[in-house]
Amino acid sequence: YLQIGNKFHINHNSKNENKLGYLNIEIENILTPLFFDNKKKLSCIVSSMNLVKLLTVENQSNENIYKIIGDFYNFLKNENWISKLIFWELELLKLVGYDLELKSIVTEEIIDDKKLYFVVSSNEKKYIPNFLVEKNNDIADFNQIFNGFKLISDYLDKSILQPNNISHPKARIEFLNTIKE
């Protein structure tokens, strides 16, 4: 029952603060086992919860993070869960202080009657998937979705992981490889 994502009700009782006391633990809601038969969703759970663990401070209460984890398990039941996941990751980054406000940093360009967004850095011009800038989570084009995940991975790497000497989480790499299949 100790699966990532299961909700528990934990009650601690002791006669006084100096005594060990006892714990009463009950499973409140089983979530992860619902997805054991889906390799992509299971990999997504491991990757996402690993990201939460990596980005949050241990033993610090954060109700907003708790709420979006609940939202995560709700949209995972939907058919278009993968496009919602990108916006969930952006919200997680925002809650931990790494807001990626794409609308304010992109430049718009029209090529062959198609609107494209890009960001220019010192050494490259990186195209941003339109649905991320326009905040349209009803996207069906898998290539755009995958490019969105790669963009978030690059942002994670350059802004959070490398400055703190943390390697890219293996669970995320495995998840990206799983959804590519």
In which residue ranges do the predicted regions lie?
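Non-catalytic alpha-helical scaffolds and adjoining flexible linkers that form interface surfaces
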Residues: 1-181
